[in-house]
């Protein structure tokens, strides 16, 4: 009986959040270990289907770095990285597009639909969903001077075709976006999935941007998980080098999205089963909530 009462209490805890978020849009970046572990894949799919059943509009943007690395290795192509971004020549771009659009996207769509979803796979080239431009990366040399490095076919999002996403939403479909953009001449661009998720969330004026990662969330200098943090404090932690490495572009992506109208951003541990539901529908959450 006690377990049944506990389940009822859990439902009651979620009720205010269910009421608050019905009809809102969540953009979720799906990546990391959650994409490779079978149990976590099922857990993620069920979380997303639950959101949809509660009247929450979900848009998924997925990564695929490990799958790209495996395929490039199979073809004998060696990649260079600048600030964590892959320098992408035409040969590499062909592999990136093949893997992200033709393999990973279809897998994500497949297991969402297997669990009762109405997922539709898209790349940024479909309906010019992600109009893009070449990204030039600023790199500081040993002498302190800054130069711009041509990353090849690495892009940034110029415009999101929200009409396409809203049409899918109106048809009760679940968009699943591969982070491949299209340039003005029809060229393909490899775009960081976190960046795409942030741009899509801003364009849709989303209630939440949620990034699934392979760590617990944002931590302070003592290594303690921060359940909530303001953008100003986030910048301070970067200056203090409490936030370093690959976490910096993630928190900056969240800050940019908040600046452009997204209500809240979350960085959560995708290695935890039902991470999305636990973060959104419990009082404590399991990751870090970032707000202005």
Curated annotation (Swiss-Prot):
Substrate binds at residues 64-65, 86, 190. Its EC number is 2.7.2.8. Pathway: Amino-acid biosynthesis; L-arginine biosynthesis; N(2)-acetyl-L-ornithine from L-glutamate: step 2/4. It catalyses: N-acetyl-L-glutamate + ATP = N-acetyl-L-glutamyl 5-phosphate + ADP. The keyword Amino-acid biosynthesis applies. Catalyzes the ATP-dependent phosphorylation of N-acetyl-L-glutamate. This is Acetylglutamate kinase.
């Amino acid at each position: 009986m006690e377990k049944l009462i506990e389940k009822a209490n859990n439902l009651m805890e979620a009720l205010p959040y269910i009421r608050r978020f019905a009809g809102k849009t969540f953009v979720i970046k799906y990546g990391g270990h959650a994409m490779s572990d079978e149990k976590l894949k099922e857990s993620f799919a069920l979380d997303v289907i639950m959101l949809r059943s509660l009247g929450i509009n979900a848009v998924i943007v997925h990564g695929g770095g490990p799958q790209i690395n495996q395929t490039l290795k199979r073809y004998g192509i060696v990649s260079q990285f600048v600030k964590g971004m892959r320098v992408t020549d035409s040969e590499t771009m062909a592999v990136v597009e093949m893997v992200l659009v033709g393999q990973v996207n279809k897998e994500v769509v497949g297991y969402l639909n297997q669990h009762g979803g109405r997922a539709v796979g898209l790349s940024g080239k479909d309906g010019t969903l992600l109009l893009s431009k070449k990204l030039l990366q600023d790199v500081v040399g040993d002498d302190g001077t800054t130069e711009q490095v041509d990353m090849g076919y690495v892009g940034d999002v110029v415009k999101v075709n929200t009409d396409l996403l809203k049409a899918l939403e109106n048809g009760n479909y679940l968009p699943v976006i591969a982070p491949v953009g299209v340039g003005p001449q029809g060229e393909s661009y490899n775009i960081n999935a976190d960046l795409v998720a942030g741009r899509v969330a801003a364009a849709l004026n989303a209630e939440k941007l949620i990034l699934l990662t392979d760590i617990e969330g944002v931590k302070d200098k003592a290594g303690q998980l921060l359940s909530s943090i303001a953008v100003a404090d986030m910048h301070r932690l970067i200056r203090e080098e409490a936030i370093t490495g690959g976490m910096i572009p993630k928190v900056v992506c969240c800050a940019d999205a908040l600046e452009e109208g997204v209500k809240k951003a979350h960085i959560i541990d995708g290695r935890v089963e039902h991470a999305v539901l636990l973060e959104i529908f419990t009082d404590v959450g399991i990751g870090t909530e970032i707000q202005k």
